[in-house]
């Protein structure tokens, strides 16, 4: 009986310690500070160009616009180039680089422009290429042909 009581007490103590460790780890991860990255590309809109949490940067959808909001002229190629340049601006402002990008979502107004977009994308993004999804969107803000969002992770 004494051994059983001791075993149950030991088990309870171990569980309590493990629970405290789990709660502590969860609190540390949830209490990480969020740092907003705001460039001219947001132009007063109700979102940040990026949010850094810990060693991860979440880049909001970027389009191929200049600081005044004007789309790059010349079709999907120049617009893709300008979009990727805007992503690089957000990355740089947060202390990240294209090599830190691990995931990308591409929104195209016309999926038939996929091959032309891909040529530019392939020439700009370093190897290994990030995971990527490409989606056709019915319409994009500013009548853009492309919008790209990204997630970057800085190696510790």
Name each region found by the language model.
Residues 8-85, 89-102, 108-156:
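N-terminal presequence-like segments and the immediate start of the first folded domain
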């Amino acid at each position: 009986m004494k051994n059983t009581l001791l075993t149950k007490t030991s088990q309870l103590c171990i569980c309590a310690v493990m629970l405290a460790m789990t709660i502590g780890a969860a609190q540390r991860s949830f209490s990480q500070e969020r740092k907003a990255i705001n460039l001219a590309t947001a132009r007063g809109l109700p979102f940040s160009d990026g949010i850094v949490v810990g060693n991860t940067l979440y880049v909001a959808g970027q389009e191929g616009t200049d600081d005044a909001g004007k789309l790059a002229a010349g079709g999907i190629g120049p617009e893709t180039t300008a979009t990727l340049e805007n992503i690089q601006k957000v990355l740089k402002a947060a202390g990240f680089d294209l090599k830190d990008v691990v995931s990308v979502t591409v929104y195209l107004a016309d999926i038939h422009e996929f091959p032309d977009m891909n040529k530019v994308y392939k020439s700009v993004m370093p190897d290994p290429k990030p995971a990527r999804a490409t989606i056709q969107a019915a319409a994009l803000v500013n009548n853009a042909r492309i919008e790209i969002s990204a997630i970057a992770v800085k190696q510790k």
